[in-house]
Structure formats: structure tokens, C-alpha cells
Amino acid sequence: ADSRKPDDRYDMSGNDALGDVKLATYEDNPWETFK
């Protein structure tokens, strides 16, 4: 949802609000969330 996300694969909806939620979860625990 913003430039801090590792790449576009993690913003699957294209929706900024949901993208920000995914980004926060990724920052907290990237491997458990996206393994």
C-alpha cells in the first residue's frame, strides 16, 4: 500500500487500506505471515 512494502506481491487487493494492514502484519512477522 506504500513504498515500505517489500514488493507488489504483498498488496494483492490493490486496496490501500487492506494493503496497509498487510504491510503492518508483514513488518511484525514476515515469515509467519507469508511463508
UniProtKB/Swiss-Prot annotation:
GO terms for biological process: killing of cells of another organism; lipid catabolic process. Binds 1 Mg(2+) ion per subunit. It comes from the Eukaryota. Its EC number is 4.6.1.-. One of its GO terms (molecular function) is toxin activity. It is an enzyme of class 4 (lyase). The keyword Magnesium applies. GO terms for cellular component: extracellular region. Mg(2+) binds at D20. Expressed by the venom gland. Contains 2 disulfide bonds. It catalyses: an N-(acyl)-sphingosylphosphocholine = an N-(acyl)-sphingosyl-1,3-cyclic phosphate + choline; an N-(acyl)-sphingosylphosphoethanolamine = an N-(acyl)-sphingosyl-1,3-cyclic phosphate + ethanolamine; a 1-acyl-sn-glycero-3-phosphocholine = a 1-acyl-sn-glycero-2,3-cyclic phosphate + choline; a 1-acyl-sn-glycero-3-phosphoethanolamine = a 1-acyl-sn-glycero-2,3-cyclic phosphate + ethanolamine. The keyword Lyase applies. Keywords: Cytolysis, Dermonecrotic toxin, Disulfide bond, Hemolysis, Lipid degradation, Lipid metabolism, Lyase, Magnesium, Metal-binding, Secreted, Toxin. Its cofactor is Mg(2+). It is found in: Secreted. Belongs to the arthropod phospholipase D family. Class II subfamily. Dermonecrotic toxins cleave the phosphodiester linkage between the phosphate and headgroup of certain phospholipids (sphingolipid and lysolipid substrates), forming an alcohol (often choline) and a cyclic phosphate. This toxin acts on sphingomyelin (SM). It may also act on ceramide phosphoethanolamine (CPE), lysophosphatidylcholine (LPC) and lysophosphatidylethanolamine (LPE), but not on lysophosphatidylserine (LPS), and lysophosphatidylglycerol (LPG). It acts by transphosphatidylation, releasing exclusively cyclic phosphate products as second products. This is Dermonecrotic toxin LgSicTox-beta-LOXN4. It comes from Loxosceles gaucho.
